[in-house]
Structure formats: C-alpha cells, structure tokens
Regions:
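Short, internal strand/loop/helix patches
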Residues: 97, 108-143, 149
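Bacterial N-terminal signal peptides
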Residues: 7-17
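Short loop/turn microsegments at loop-to-beta-strand junctions
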Residues: 35, 61-63, 141-143
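Short pre-active-site segment immediately N-terminal to redox-active cysteine/selenocysteine motifs
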Residues: 60-62, 67-71, 103
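N-proximal helix/coil linker or "cap" segments that precede and/or mark the start of modular domains
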Residues: 16-41, 55
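Conserved redox-active cysteine motifs that mediate thiol-disulfide chemistry
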Residues: 66-87
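Thiol-/selenol-based redox modules, centered on thioredoxin-like
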Residues: 140-177
Length: 177
C-alpha cells in the first residue's frame, strides 16, 4: 500500500514542481512588451469601472501580480502587503493590480473584508495568466511583473514567497525610477 501511495504522489509532485519551473520559461522576459489584457475586476475606490486593460495604466508603472486564490493565507498576506504600501507605490507613479481565477464577487468580498485598496482582476479561464507564464490550472501561479510606463517588462519575480514581497517590489521600483 505504501508503494502505491508513493507511486501516485511522486508524479504529482514532479508535475507541480516542473510546471512551476516551466512557468519561468514561458513568462515574458525583461525588455519584452507586456502582453495586453482586458479583464473584469473590482476596485472599491472606482465603483463605476468593471473592466480594465493594460492601456489603462499607460504612463505609469504597473505592479501586476498573479496569485492563486482570494482568502487563502499566503494570498491574503501578499495582498495586505501591497495594500499597506499603496501610498508609497502611488508616490512613485505606480499602480497595483492583482490577478487570480476568482470571480468579481469573490474579489469584492476579499477587498471589503481584508481592506484591499487597489484593483483585483478576474481571469477564470487563465487566458491572461497563461500569457504571463503564470497559469497552473485551475489557479494562477504566484508571479509578479513590474511593467514600465511605456508598457515593457522591467522586472519579474517567479514563484514568489509572499512574506515581504511588496517591500521587495517597492525597493526595485525605486531603483528603476
């Protein structure tokens, strides 16, 4: 029985780790033009807007991070980290956008309950996540991209650890300006 369990678990572990490594290969490179997107989402500060696209952020730095699921421990930690530093990002001409497979209702609840003060976008089929090498069905992988005001990938973080990630992104942003 033990061998049966091990023989079943090992392929799943290898598949998960390989996909995580492979996402690095499929993610846009620094200097590439950022893939365009048009996604529905939620921002509690902009009640009249429900759809966002890359061109909405033209002329500003964009921190675009992909994450697996609203309300999970790591995702909440990462989201709150960006929320706490939102003013610092704004002072540096940067917007923050989080993308996951969750729907708008989930994003609205997540923003309300966890005081998230920036835009969360819904990518339920992973089409945009996949363009950024960030899709491990049925979830987005935890990757972050810093997009320059002219729409190019300026920096990328693959398979992010959420603790202090927002501070790390802010420090890189400050060096880029």
């Amino acid at each position: 029985m033990r061998y049966l369990v091990v023989s079943i678990l090992i392929p799943f572990i290898l598949l998960f780790n390989c996909k995580s490594v492979l996402s690095f290969d499929f993610a846009p490179e620094v200097g590439d033009i950022a893939p365009n997107f048009q996604l529905e989402g939620f921002n509690k500060n902009i009640k009249t807007k429900t759809t966002w696209e890359l061109s909405d952020f033209q002329g500003k730095w964009l921190v675009m991070y992909f994450y697996p699921k609203d309300f999970t421990a790591g995702c909440t930690l990462e989201a709150k980290g960006f929320s706490e530093l939102k003013k610092d990002f704004s002072k540096n001409n940067a917007e923050i956008v989080g993308i996951s497979a969750d729907n708008q209702d989930s994003h609205e609840s997540f923003c309300s309950e966890k005081s998230i003060n920036y835009t969360l976008l819904s990518d339920p089929d992973g089409i945009i996540s996949d363009k950024y090498g960030s899709w491990i069905p049925p979830f987005s992988d935890r990757n972050t991209f810093l997009i320059s005001p002219d729409g190019k990938i300026s920096y990328r973080w693959i398979s992010v650890v959420p603790i202090n990630h927002a501070k790390e992104v802010l420090n890189v942003l400050k060096k880029k300006i």
